[in-house]
């Protein structure tokens, strides 16, 4: 079922594109010589909610859980807010509707977000931000466990498996 959802909604390419546009807009809106120190897909896998969180401060990125300067970037930038509302919200509503019938959706949702982070890394989206901490996380999640899951997806990608 998840494969059908991915194919029909183009979930991963959509999220990747929205993330790239959000990162670009955040860089323009909050220019700084400092690189981003932390990036997260901050989400609720139960409901399909997804936010991008950012910080430029390494100490904040290193906290458990990280303390984001910008907890919900797409809500802070009006043009990006509209973009997310127009493009992501219909997919989220479909996810919420289908999730009730498919117990595996929340874990598949998280795994797809991890795949997108790895794809963004591979594309060089985070190259201007050396040492950036990357996460796919939920509120009150164990960030160490979440990072371990991201490492597994990253390793699969490096071994030639589709991330």
Feature names for model-found ranges:
Residues 1-16, 20, 24-31, 35, ...:
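Acidic, proline/glycine-rich low-complexity IDRs
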Residues 27, 38, 84, 88, ...:
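Short linear motifs embedded in intrinsically disordered, proline/glycine-rich low-complexity segments
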Residues 45, 63, 93, 105-106, ...:
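Generic detector of bulky aromatic hydrophobic side chains
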């Amino acid at each position: 079922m998840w494969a059908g959802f991915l194919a029909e909604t183009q979930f991963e390419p959509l999220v990747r594109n929205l993330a790239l546009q959000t990162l670009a807009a955040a860089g323009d809106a909050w220019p700084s010589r400092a690189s981003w120190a932390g990036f997260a897909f901050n989400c609720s896998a139960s409901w399909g909610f997804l936010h991008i969180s950012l910080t430029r401060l390494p100490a904040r990125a290193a906290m458990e859980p990280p303390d984001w300067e910008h907890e919900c970037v797409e809500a802070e930038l009006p043009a990006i807010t509209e973009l997310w509302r127009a493009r992501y919200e219909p997919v989220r509503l479909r996810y919420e509707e289908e999730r009730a019938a498919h117990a595996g959706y929340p874990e598949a949702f998280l795994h797809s977000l991890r795949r997108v982070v790895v794809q963004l890394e591979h594309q060089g989206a985070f190259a201007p931000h050396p040492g950036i901490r990357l996460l796919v996380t939920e509120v009150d999640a164990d960030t160490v466990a979440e990072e371990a899951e991201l490492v597994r997806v990253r390793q699969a990608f490096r071994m030639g498996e589709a991330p």
